């Protein structure tokens, strides 16, 4: 269970009765005040979580007291302290980064004071945690004995620590607010002074630029026109060369086409002559083969006729 040690502190400060001295329920006295560190800055919100953490423990029941000897409480408090100090340090570094408009001596003094205030707040929170650790050890050693005196001493010390922590936290908050206001005022003065110094220079620069523009406008236009004419002449020259080259390429292509047509005609004539020669070679062979084939067919027909005549008398017998 979270933050059980702080619950024990709350129970003690509430004046819980001991086992040996029963009596009416005492009035609960909260040793911390309502969370007042609910500002817009992250470090103020971190301190607010620390106070809310303690106030939440007050709502725990008495059944958790037997579990309060765990070290979980000190771990939780350590995390809250580290978170608070981290946020305070980040905000302090942010303010130091904004100390540009002030002198180096003032910047060093402000940084030193902020570090001292931060250290005091951190020491107060560490004191609360250390007192809880010490009380845990003493309670562990005094189990079965009366702890009324120990509770009274712890409650008194925690009240003193609470007052000191509240005072140091308020001091840190006031210092940060004063330094932030001073930084804003210094930055505004620096910006105003810079604007006053740069105003005449900007006006002079504007007038000089306008004068130079007026003086340089005419030569620039003349140079631009001359350059444009030169560019047009070069483009026309390149266009003429391109047209001449295209005409030459067209003539060369026409000449190549004529040569190709002549070579095609020659190839057709050569092919026709070769075809005629082949025809002259193969026609006698084809005619000879036709005569031989006709003779062969005629002999076969004669043989078939003779065979038919011979087989007919045999059938009659």
Curated annotation (Swiss-Prot):
Coiled coil: none
Gene Ontology biological process terms from the UniProt entry: acylglycerol homeostasis; cholesterol efflux; cholesterol metabolic process; chylomicron remnant clearance; high-density lipoprotein particle assembly; intermediate-density lipoprotein particle clearance; lipoprotein biosynthetic process; melanosome organization
Keyword Metal-binding: no
Region Homooligomerization, residue ranges: 265-317
Gene Ontology MF annotations: amyloid-beta binding; cholesterol transfer activity; heparan sulfate proteoglycan binding; heparin binding; identical protein binding; low-density lipoprotein particle receptor binding; phosphatidylcholine-sterol O-acyltransferase activator activity; phospholipid binding
Signal peptide stretch: 1-18
Any Pfam family matching the protein: Apolipoprotein
Annotated region described as 8 X 22 AA approximate tandem repeats, given as residue ranges: 79-254
Description of post-translational modifications: APOE exists as multiple glycosylated and sialylated glycoforms within cells and in plasma. The extent of glycosylation and sialylation are tissue and context specific.
Specificity for association with VLDL, as annotated region: 277-289
Residue ranges, annotated region (LDL and other lipoprotein receptors binding): 157-167
GO cellular component, as recorded: chylomicron; extracellular exosome; extracellular matrix; extracellular space; extracellular vesicle; high-density lipoprotein particle; intermediate-density lipoprotein particle; low-density lipoprotein particle
Keyword match Transmembrane: no
Residues at which heparin binds: 161-164, 228-235
Keywords, comma-separated and alphabetical: Chylomicron, Endosome, Extracellular matrix, Glycoprotein, HDL, Heparin-binding, Lipid transport, Lipid-binding, Oxidation, Repeat, Secreted, Signal, Transport, VLDL
Region (Lipid-binding and lipoprotein association): 209-289
Family note: Belongs to the apolipoprotein A1/A4/E family.
Subunit-structure text: Homotetramer. May interact with ABCA1; functionally associated with ABCA1 in the biogenesis of HDLs. May interact with APP/A4 amyloid-beta peptide; the interaction is extremely stable in vitro but its physiological significance is unclear. May interact with MAPT. May interact with MAP2. In the cerebrospinal fluid, interacts with secreted SORL1. Interacts with PMEL; this allows the loading of PMEL luminal fragment on ILVs to induce fibril nucleation.
This protein's name: Apolipoprotein E
């Amino acid at each position: 269970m979270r933050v059980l040690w702080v619950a024990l502190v709350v129970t003690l400060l509430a004046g819980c009765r001991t086992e040996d001295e029963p009596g009416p329920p005492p009035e609960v006295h909260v040793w911390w005040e309502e969370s007042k560190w609910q500002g817009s800055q992250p470090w103020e919100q971190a301190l607010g979580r620390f106070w809310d953490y303690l106030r939440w423990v007050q709502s725990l029941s008495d059944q958790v007291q037997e579990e309060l000897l765990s070290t979980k409480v000190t771990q939780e408090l350590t995390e809250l302290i580290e978170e608070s100090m981290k946020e305070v340090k980040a905000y302090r570094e942010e303010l130091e980064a904004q100390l540009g408009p002030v002198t180096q001596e003032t910047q060093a003094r402000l940084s030193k004071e902020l570090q001292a205030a931060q250290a005091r707040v951190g020491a107060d929170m560490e004191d609360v945690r250390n007192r809880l650790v010490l009380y845990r050890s003493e309670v562990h050693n005094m189990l079965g004995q009366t702890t009324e005196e120990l509770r009274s001493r712890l409650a008194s010390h925690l009240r003193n620590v609470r007052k000191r922590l509240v005072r140091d936290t308020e001091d840190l908050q006031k210092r940060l607010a004063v330094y932030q206001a001073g930084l804003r005022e210094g930055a505004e003065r620096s910006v105003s002074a810079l604007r006053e110094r740069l105003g005449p220079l900007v006006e002079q620069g504007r007038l000089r630029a306008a004068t130079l523009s007026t003086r340089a406008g005419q030569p620039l236009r003349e140079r631009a026109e001359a350059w444009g004419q030169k560019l047009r002449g070069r483009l026309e020259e390149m266009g003429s060369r391109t047209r001449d080259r295209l005409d030459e390429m067209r003539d060369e292509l026409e000449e190549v086409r004529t040569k190709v047509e002549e070579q095609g005609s020659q190839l057709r004539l050569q092919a026709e002559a070769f075809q005629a020669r082949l025809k002259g070679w193969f026609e006698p062979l084809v005619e000879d083969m036709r005569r031989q084939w006709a003779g062969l067919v005629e002999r076969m027909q004669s043989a078939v006729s003779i065979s038919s005549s011979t087989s007919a008398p045999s059938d009659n017998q």
